[in-house]
Amino acid sequence: MITKNDLNTIFKWAKNTDFPLKKAPTAEGYSNKDIYISWLKGAGKKVFIRKKIMTEEVADIFLKDEIIFATFSTFESGTILNPHRDPDVYPCRYKRIQLPLKIPNRNHCFMIWDGKKVLW
């Protein structure tokens, strides 16, 4: 099970890591600006983890079966993502956890869930 302590460890590590970024492939109309990502974990027939940029403690957390896929993403100021649903790429249901690392203006960085504005 992923614990709050695990999430705090990932958060602290990620805040101090310089991620190698690549432009994310996105569908037409998904976003008004480019999004950049750094792949961290993928799981399918085999599990792949980008250990080169992880501490041993963080790699151990990412090795847990509960984490199926992980990326670091960065959004430019003013990025708008239209409401969307991620495709079902795994055979079982999964939850998505988003850990905002840097929020320049709390009132301008938010998500709308079920018609309600959610601030971090």
Task: Cite the ranges covered by each PLM segment.
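Catalytic core of non-heme Fe(II) oxygenases with the double-stranded beta-helix
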Residues: 55-120
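Non-heme Fe(II)/2-oxoglutarate
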Residues: 1-64
